[in-house]
């Protein structure tokens, strides 16, 4: 029981990392050209008792309008008073963004629920090219359900000491991220769980029970071919004492309304997805992870459903 948790990823895994960039990286807040409200859920390894389940809700948006200051006082009365305003508005400006998230994650006898807030600043490097930095704070409640614990050795002193700890414990943590982006390119890197908290009752035999730093990186680029869009992407998640998670995928969409996707994850699973956009503000997408290798013998796969609401979306190219 303790071994399983010690070697598991401690932040949720998603099969839609491109749509869920903010879930991993606070610097992704405000990258989209709209107010992004996302609700998602994932059932992993269907068919396995007490398999991981994840639910999340988050929202993020840039603040204010991307407009310049009033420079008309620099113009002589006989000239064009609006010239300097037009010039100022044509230049990219520093942007600020905020975001918030709630989540619930369960895996076997352990569950975690939490809430987080994030801030990001977006610095213009050149026209349409931005570099953003983000910081986030998070409060998480960890719960251990003794009734679901399966122990091979009931007289294990490490397990007895772990049981002497709290069933429920509140921990605080933080995260940091950076993002480079244009209207087509996305490159991100983030560090989650900056504080390596320990759980009460943790022993040297369960040294990885506490929160560990998780590093996440992603890259994607969109190619527009008339009404057809092709977006190859890759993501990597690294955590101490856990297998390296590598994701590579391709999204095909028509007129940004309908999409299909395929991806491969190095944990021996192939991912297939479909999605559509309705009324220009709602996007519903579903992915199925087809297991391969030994997992296929005990699981029928993983399912993930995501609903995105895109408010104040100026045009269809805002992604």
Question: Which residue ranges define each predicted feature?
Answer:
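Sec/Tat signal peptide C-region and signal peptidase I cleavage site
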Residues: 4-8
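Subset of outer-membrane beta-barrel
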Residues: 9-319
């Amino acid at each position: 029981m303790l071994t399983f948790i010690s070697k598991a990823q401690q932040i949720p895994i998603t099969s839609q990392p491109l749509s869920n960039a903010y879930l991993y990286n606070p610097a992704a807040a405000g990258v989209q050209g709209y107010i992004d409200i996302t609700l998602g859920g994932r059932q992993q390894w269907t068919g396995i008792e007490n398999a991981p389940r994840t639910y999340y809700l988050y929202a993020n948006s840039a603040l204010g309008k991307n407009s310049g200051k009033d420079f008309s006082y620099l113009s002589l009365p006989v000239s064009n008073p609006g010239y300097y305003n037009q010039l100022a508005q044509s230049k990219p400006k520093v942007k600020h963004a905020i975001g918030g998230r709630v989540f619930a994650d369960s895996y076997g006898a352990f569950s975690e629920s939490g809430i987080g807030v994030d801030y990001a600043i977006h610095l213009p490097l050149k026209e349409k090219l931005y570099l953003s930095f983000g910081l986030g704070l998070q409060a998480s409640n960890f719960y251990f359900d003794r009734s679901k614990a399966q122990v091979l050795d009931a007289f294990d002193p490490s397990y007895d000491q772990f049981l002497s700890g709290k069933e429920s414990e509140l921990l605080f943590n933080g995260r940091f991220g950076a993002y480079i982006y244009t209207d087509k390119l996305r490159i991100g890197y983030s560090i989650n769980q900056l504080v390596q908290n320990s759980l009460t009752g943790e022993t040297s035999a369960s040294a990885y029970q506490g929160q560990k730093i998780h590093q996440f990186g992603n890259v994607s680029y969109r190619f527009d071919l008339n009404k057809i869009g092709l977006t190859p992407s890759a993501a990597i998640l690294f955590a101490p004492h856990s297998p390296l998670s590598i994701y590579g995928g391709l999204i095909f969409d028509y007129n940004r309304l309908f999409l299909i996707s395929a991806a491969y994850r190095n944990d021996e699973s192939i991912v297939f997805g479909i999605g559509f956009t309705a009324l220009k503000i709602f996007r519903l997408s579903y992915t199925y992870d087809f297991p391969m290798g030994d997992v296929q013998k005990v699981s029928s796969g993983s399912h993930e459903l995501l609903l995105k609401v895109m408010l104040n979306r100026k045009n269809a190219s805002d992604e």
